[in-house]
Swiss-Prot record:
Protein's UniProt name: Exosome complex component Rrp42
Purpose: Non-catalytic component of the exosome, which is a complex involved in RNA degradation. Contributes to the structuring of the Rrp41 active site.
Organism the protein comes from: Pyrobaculum aerophilum (strain ATCC 51768 / DSM 7523 / JCM 9630 / CIP 104966 / NBRC 100827 / IM2)
Record lineage: Archaea, Thermoproteota, Thermoprotei, Thermoproteales, Thermoproteaceae
Subunit structure: Component of the archaeal exosome complex. Forms a hexameric ring-like arrangement composed of 3 Rrp41-Rrp42 heterodimers. The hexameric ring associates with a trimer of Rrp4 and/or Csl4 subunits.
Cell compartment(s), UniProt: Cytoplasm
Protein family according to the UniProt entry: Belongs to the RNase PH family. Rrp42 subfamily.
Length: 274
C-alpha cells in the first residue's frame, strides 16, 4: 500500500510557481493549453482479465486503472433491497515523487469517497436490481489504482470507474444442493447501466482570479482553490470543494466551465464504450 504526502509536505519551487501564476494571469499555461482546455484523454476497457470489469484512463500523463470484483454479501441496513457499492483507492509507490509507503491517507480516502458519491446518487447503476433472494445482495467492489499522478486524479478515477462498471459482467446467482445462494462465475451477464446517466466528475482549479480545467500536478501545487462537480445528465449529483475558497460568482463561473469540460469527457466515454 502507499499514501500521498499531505499538501503541506509537497512543494514546488518559488520560481516555478510564479511562472505558472504569471502565465495563467495572461490565460496561458506552462504546457501550452488555455484555461478551458483539457489534456488528451484515452479510455480502454477490459484491461484486467482477472476482474469482472475493468478500465484504464489516461489524461495526459495521469494514469488510473479501475477493477471491479463482484461478490455476494449483506445489504446495508438502511437499504435492505439494494446492492452494495464499495470503492477503494490506492496510489502506487511509483505514481508520484510524494508517494510514501503506508496505509491509504486522507487523500486516497477522499478520492474513493468522491467517486463513490457520484456513482451512488446518479442512477447510472440501478442498485435495486442488485438485490437477490435470501436477504443477500450483489456487492460491487471498485478498486482504483493510481499508476501515475500528473494531476486531476478525481476526474480520471471517476471516469475509470464508470467505464469499468460498463465493462462488468455479473456472475449469475444460483443455489447449490443445500439451497445456499452463491455465484456461478462460469455464467455471467452484463451489469445493467444507464449510460445516459453516467456520472462525470469535473474539477476546476483557481489560481489568482483565473479558473481553469484539468490542473496538472505542478498546477495543483500552486492552487488557491479547487472545486469538483459531478454531473449526471444536466443535474449536479455531487459537489466537493477540496481546497481554498470561492466567492458566489466564482462558483457560478466554475460551474459553467465544468459543464463545458463535462461534455468533452462524456463524449470520450461514449466513444470508448461503443
Amino acid at each position: 500500500m502507499a499514501s500521498i504526502s499531505p499538501y503541506g509536505k509537497r512543494f514546488i519551487s518559488y520560481l516555478r510557481r510564479e511562472q505558472i501564476r504569471r502565465l495563467l494571469a495572461t490565460k496561458y499555461r506552462v504546457d501550452g493549453r488555455g484555461p478551458e482546455q483539457t489534456r488528451n484523454v484515452e479510455i480502454n476497457v477490459g484491461v484486467v482479465k482477472t476482474a469482472d470489469g475493468s478500465a484504464e484512463v489516461k489524461l495526459g500523463k495521469t494514469h488510473v486503472v479501475a477493477g471491479v470484483k463482484v461478490g455476494l454479501g449483506q445489504p446495508f441496513p438502511d437499504a435492505p433491497d439494494e446492492g452494495v457499492l464499495v470503492v477503494n483507492a490506492e496510489v502506487l509507490p511509483h505514481a508520484s515523487p510524494y508517494t510514501e509507503v503506508g496505509p491509504p491517507d486522507e487523500f486516497a480516502i477522499e478520492l474513493a469517497r468522491v467517486v463513490d458519491r457520484g456513482i451512488r446518487h446518479c442512477g447510472y447503476v440501478d442498485f435495486k436490481k442488485l438485490a437477490v433472494e435470501g436477504g443477500k445482495a450483489y456487492v460491487l467492489w471498485i478498486d482504483l489504482y493510481v499508476i501515475n499522478d500528473d494531476g486531476n486524479l478525481i476526474d480520471v478515477a471517476n471516469l475509470a470507474s464508470v467505464a469499468a462498471l460498463k465493462n462488468t459482467q455479473l456472475p449469475v446467482v444460483v443455489k447449490d444442493e443445500a439451497g445456499v445462494v452463491k455465484l456461478d462465475r462460469n455464467n455471467k451477464a452484463p451489469l445493467p447501466v444507464d449510460i445516459s446517466k453516467a456520472p462525470i466528475a469535473v474539477s476546476v482549479g483557481k489560481i489568482g482570479n483565473v479558473l481553469f480545467l484539468d490542473p496538472t500536478f505542478e498546477e495543483e501545487l500552486s492552487l488557491d482553490g479547487r472545486i469538483t462537480f459531478t454531473f449526471s445528465e444536466d443535474k449536479i449529483v455531487a459537489a466537493q470543494k477540496t481546497l481554498g475558497y470561492f466567492t458566489q460568482s466564482e462558483i457560478e463561473a466554475a460551474l459553467n466551465l465544468a459543464l463545458r469540460g463535462r461534455d468533452r469527457l462524456l463524449e470520450a466515454l461514449k466513444s470508448a464504450l461503443k
